[in-house]
Regions:
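Amphipathic/hydrophobic helical signal segments and adjacent flexible N-terminal regions
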Residues: 2-6, 21-61, 65, 69-78, ...
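Residues at the start of alpha-helices and the adjacent loop-to-helix junctions
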Residues: 2-3, 14, 147
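Bacterial N-terminal signal peptides
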Residues: 9-19
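Central antiparallel beta-sheet cores of small beta-barrel/beta-sandwich binding domains
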Residues: 51-54, 60, 64-175
Length: 175
């Protein structure tokens, strides 16, 4: 009985099974053409002008609070995350890519308000705040690169012999 069943199974596999493992290949037809975009395809968003990008940057950071976390980097290792908060009172363009950010900076037991001169460069439509060796009263000298995107921020910073990473969300103060 087992040999009969094995023979029938082998015959079925040989007869039908080979088609299971074969791949159907579609022969190219002369009528095959690239598909045209459908009406459902959304048109690309128009790019904002430099003036519109500056206005958006200013609106994002005026009367804004950046709340998030930072961690130190020591010997290539990330430290524990700690909370921080930056309150931006106002942002003004000085000229070219130089801006003045009036900020209240709170971290640890420190709470200071200071005008911070920064450069603002762009990665496409995304502003990147650049701070190079800027003295913060009562705190030291810092350098940083902070990207602003869709009401979030992320960046890296150094201060003397230490540095770290930072990230969080941006919220507008209600009037």
């Amino acid at each position: 009985m087992n040999s009969t069943l094995a023979s029938i199974t082998s015959a079925l596999v040989l007869t039908f099974g080979m088609n299971v493992f074969a791949q159907d290949t579609k022969k190219p037809e002369a009528t095959d053409k690239p598909k045209e975009p459908t009406a459902k395809t959304s048109p690309a968003k128009p790019k904002l002008t430099p003036e519109e990008l500056e206005a958006k940057f200013k609106a994002t950071l005026t009367k804004a609070t950046l709340s998030g976390r930072w961690c130190s980097i020591k010997e290539g290792q990330l430290g524990l995350e700690k909370e921080d908060k930056y309150t931006i009172i106002g942002v003004n363009k000085v000229g070219g890519d130089v801006w003045m950010i009036n900020a209240r900076i709170q971290y640890g037991k420190k709470d200071i308000t200071a005008p911070i001169p920064v450069q603002v460069k762009r990665a496409g439509d995304t502003p990147v705040i650049i701070v190079d060796d800027v003295g913060v009263p009562g705190s030291g000298t810092y350098s940083a690169r902070v990207m602003i995107y869709n009401n979030t921020y992320a960046g890296t910073w150094t201060g003397g012999d230490h540095g770290g990473l930072m990230n969080g969300v941006i919220t507008q103060q209600k009037e």
